[in-house]
Swiss-Prot record:
SMART domains: HTH_GNTR. It holds the Pfam family GntR. Residues 57-76 bind DNA. The keyword DNA-binding applies. InterPro entries: GntR_C (IPR011711), TF_FadR/GntR_C (IPR008920), Tscrpt_reg_HTH_GntR (IPR000524), WH-like_DNA-bd_sf (IPR036388), WH_DNA-bd_sf (IPR036390). This is Uncharacterized HTH-type transcriptional regulator in the TAR-I ttuE-ttuC' intergenic region.
Length: 171
């Protein structure tokens, strides 16, 4: 069972707003839903919530330090994404990816990133050098994380690499 506050330490690192601010009135309802969504998604991605993990809405809300309403809405979004299944009156259960899901994800990723790399190959040399430097930084961060046996750090650097590749190709 996940200890109270474990999400705060492990899963919220990528949330745009600190969750301590979410209890205040200054953050919109949409901001709270987004923060809950990203925190839970990150907990799934980092295996804080592994496949098969079951949690009640109130338990997750308590861990995030927010009311049930944004957590409820975040869970609905996560179910639409196929990451969780809502169990009426019980909470959620984390879905496992099937081998077919993983294969499809990689096929789409390869197609998109191949097109992005082709597009980047056509840009002006000075801009290309900047993009290469960003990609090199992300790659070096991945290597450093592996040397420290830091899987979450490696995943964050890997995500930064892929996001940089696609974002720079889109400009």
């Amino acid at each position: 069972m996940v200890k109270p506050g474990q999400i705060l330490r492990a899963a919220v690192r990528e949330t745009a707003e600190p969750l301590t601010e979410l209890a205040g009135d200054s953050v919109s309802s949409a901001g709270r839903v987004s923060a809950a969504y990203h925190a839970i998604r990150n907990a799934i991605r980092t295996n804080v919530f592994p496949p098969g993990y079951q949690a009640a809405e109130i338990e997750i809300a308590r861990q995030l330090g927010m009311s049930r309403t944004p957590v409820h809405e975040a869970m609905a979004r996560l179910q639409e994404d196929g990451l969780v299944r809502i169990l009426p009156k019980k909470g959620i259960i984390i879905c496992a990816l099937s081998p077919a899901d993983i294969e499809e994800i990689y096929e789409v990723t390869i197609a998109l990133e191949g097109a992005a790399a082709s597009r980047l190959a056509m840009i002006d040399a000075p801009v290309k050098a900047e993009v290469v430097a960003l990609l090199r930084d992300a790659t070096e961060a991945m290597v450093a994380a592996l040397e420290r046996n830091d899987l979450p750090g490696w995943a964050a650097a890997d995500e930064r690499f892929h996001e940089t590749l696609v974002a720079c190709a889109a400009q």
